[in-house]
Amino acid sequence: MDTAQKQRWAITLSYDGSRFYGWQKQADGVPTVQAALETALAQIAGEAVSTTVAGRTDTGVHATAQVVHFDTTAARPQQAWVRGVNAHLPEGIAVLHARQVAPEFHARFDAYGRHYRYLLESVPVRSPLLKNRAGWTHLKLDIGPMRRAAALLIGEQDFSSFRAAECQAKSPVKTIYRADLTQSSGLVRLDLHGNAFLHHMVRNIMGALVYVGSGRLSVEGFAALIQERSRLKAPPTFMPDGLYLTGVDYPEAYGIIRPQIPEWL
């Protein structure tokens, strides 16, 4: 195959993580986002397509604006990679945008920022309508201490206390630019913007913040937890249900659209 004829495309997609066993293809053939997407892309391209993602997501984790790139020799109009691919995707995944990009564009390595939201339901009885869409605790949470604790995350730090044991990142040092907490009608929203995130980092942070909000961990204890740089004394990893990848930042020259977070979220 003549590689000079290849085109590189970037697509932005949204998916319901509760329907899939994470992003990455698996040998046993269980449904994953990558497997479903590559199958649909191949239908339009008329050839096998391999994808590279901005950031892999675990089972149950959602995305409103995941970014993927792929190479193909198939000359197709932009809408073929949107409406055409969507026609071949299973329920729970949709391509939002597609754009031909420079051959050197890389969905993972060119990303300089990532945005996550954790949606948490804090009510005595979990709503059946929000199951798989939001995390849940029956505990009443005090948002004030949670906000003060979240503010301690901002900056470049070693986040080993919020790192999964199986994390493959070369360094636990990451930079958090923004950590906002809001509360409305029994729903707590945690918005994090950072240069990159460790495996389970957001879910581990959420678990610790729930401890703070429920009085099981003080703000000072949260600060000490960060300094411990160890998972051994940290609260458990919180459920994946409420975690959403809501955006990826790229240099403007690539023209990658980052959609607004949906109003329902």
UniProtKB/Swiss-Prot annotation:
The gene is truA. Its EC number is 5.4.99.12. Homodimer. InterPro entries: PsdUridine_synth_cat_dom_sf, PsdUridine_synth_TruA, PsdUridine_synth_TruA_a/b_dom, PsdUridine_synth_TruA_C, TruA/RsuA/RluB/E/F_N. Coiled coil: none annotated. CDD domains: PseudoU_synth_EcTruA (cd02570). It is an enzyme of class 5 (isomerase). Gene3D superfamilies: Pseudouridine synthase I, catalytic domain, C-terminal subdomain, Pseudouridine synthase I, catalytic domain, N-terminal subdomain. This is tRNA pseudouridine synthase A. GO terms for biological process: tRNA pseudouridine synthesis. It comes from the Bacteria. GO terms for molecular function: RNA binding; tRNA pseudouridine(38-40) synthase activity. Substrate binds at residue 116. It comes from Neisseria meningitidis serogroup C / serotype 2a (strain ATCC 700532 / DSM 15464 / FAM18).
